[in-house]
Amino acid sequence: MIKKLASFIFHSLGWKSVGEVPSDIKKYIIIGAPHTSNWDFFYGILFFLMKGIPLKFFIKKEWYFFPFNILLKSLGGIPVDRSKKENLTDQIADFFNQHEKLAILITPEGTRSYNPQWKKGFYYISQKTKAP
């Protein structure tokens, strides 16, 4: 019921999902684009619910404050510190490699503003983790 409702809302809002994840793949990266609004977070949740995928997403630690931190954690949010010397792709790759089964959503533009040039972090994470 949740999948059907999420799918109905997702498609009613004009979004589409391209491709399917083979059931034998335990770890993978999902690209969410374009990321031009804070509403994209809501669309991402709908996508994961529609596909029956346990939600995990990375979000800058600045968003982790009370009471939002409780909501974000319950939704699968993982805070990242972008000021650390270790770059973000390494932090995400390390997290990814610590889990046997994991799907993560990455928005490759690197900003909510329109940006036709994608950053390459998702590619480097895929290479470091050998995840499709």
List the predicted regions and their residue ranges.
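Soluble catalytic domains of membrane acyltransferases
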Residues: 10-132
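Helix-enriched interaction subdomains in cytosolic or periplasmic regions
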Residues: 1-3
